Amino acid sequence: MLDIKSLSASIDGKKILEGFDLKIKPGEVHAIMGPNGSGKSTLANVLTGKNGYEIEGQVLYQGKDLLNLPIEERAQKGLFMAFQYPLEIAGVNTNNFLKTSLNTIRKVRGQKELDSLDFLKLVKTKTKNLKIDEKILSRQLNVGFSGGEKKKNEILQMTILEPKLAILDETDSGLDIDALRIVSDGVNALRSKERSFLIITHYQRLLDYIKPDFVHVLVDGKIAKTGCGELAVELEKVGYEKMGANK
């Protein structure tokens, strides 16, 4: 699914990732944990095509070079990113945004586009399953949303688009327990042998609900340690300094 080899990334002359390696197979859930400034969000930005980085190394997605693909093509090929700070887009209706996004993906997949009625049935089912208020659909995209509402909307998008690889960049940040469960329920509902997840988080609590296959500790732009879910529990007890992070 995703094969990262010797990835280095710099911005404004400062190297953030250096010699980063990671391989994610179809159906796997990987969690990346690390202290602030370790390169977690930089990794997500590089994978999703954010501009401004000087990049070296290789990233293969489904066997093809990911780094040369424009942002929109990455999304069309099934790469999804749930942002830590989702953008507000005034004048764009949430329901229309979701419908357009889904039909764009369906067209690329060679599937028939959904009309308004069929999409409405789909999105109502998704909001009900996630316990999200349907009123969110009639509002402007993320405008005036609370932090929790924005994160819920990201997960709603994910469940509608059904990506092949979903990246969650600290989606659990600032969430209360109810919103955290909505996020985890959305991920768990999509888990399958064909779909993979890369969960980037600072804390272990999200991994109480989403059981990862692998946990990686990112320190100074490199993976310092890899283990199973128990590694996240260990981190909560001993902290990142024990893994080689600077104070």
Residues covered by each model-derived region:
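The feature captures the beta-strand-to-loop junction immediately N-terminal to the Walker
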Residues: M33-P35
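Helix-to-loop junction immediately C-terminal to a conserved catalytic motif
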Residues: T48-G49
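ABC ATPase NBD Q-loop/coupling interface
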Residues: Q58-R74, N142
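ABC-family P-loop ATPase nucleotide-binding domains
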Residues: L87-K164
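Conserved beta-strand-loop-alpha-helix hinge in the C-terminal portion
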Residues: F214, L218, K222-G244
